[in-house]
Amino acid sequence: MACSTLPKSPKDKIDPRDLLIPLILFLSLKGARSAAPGSSPHQVYNITWEVTNGDRETVWAISGRLYVSGRDPGLTFGIRLRYQNLGPRVPIGPNPVLAD
C-alpha cells in the first residue's frame, strides 16, 4: 500500500512539483515486495516542499520506508533548485536572416 502527500500550490500556473507524482508511483511499484503470508508491506512516501527567500530557492524531499522484518531498506532523496540572478535582461531582437 503506497501513500503520498502533496501540498497544494498557491500558484495557478503549472508547478514543477506536480511532475514528481510519476516518480512516486515508480518508487511505489519498484519498492513493492511480496509479503509473508498473513502480513502486508506498508510503504509510505512523503513529499515535503519548502520555499526559502521568497521564491528564490525551492527544496523538495522524498522519503520512504518499507516496514519489513530485519533491516529497513528505506530511502531518502532530495532535490534543490536555486534561482540565480543572471544580470539584466538584454533584448536580442529579431533574427536578420529570417527577414529575407
From Swiss-Prot:
Compartments reported by the entry: Virion membrane
Keywords from the UniProt entry: Fusion of virus membrane with host cell membrane, Fusion of virus membrane with host membrane, Glycoprotein, Host-virus interaction, Membrane, Signal, Viral attachment to host cell, Viral penetration into host cytoplasm, Virion, Virus entry into host cell
SUPFAM superfamilies: ENV polyprotein, receptor-binding domain (SSF49830)
Principal subcellular localization: virion
Glycosylation: residue positions: 46
Signal peptide, first to last residue: 1-34
Keyword Signal attached: yes
Biological processes annotated in GO: fusion of virus membrane with host plasma membrane; symbiont entry into host cell; virion attachment to host cell
GO cellular component: membrane; virion membrane
Miscellaneous comment text of the record: This protein is synthesized as a Env-vMpl chimeric protein. The sequence shown here corresponds to the Env homolog fragment of the chimera. The Env homolog part of the chimera has an internal deletion compared to other retroviruses Env sequences.
Protein name, entry field: Envelope glycoprotein
Organism: Myeloproliferative leukemia virus (MpLV)
Gene designation: env
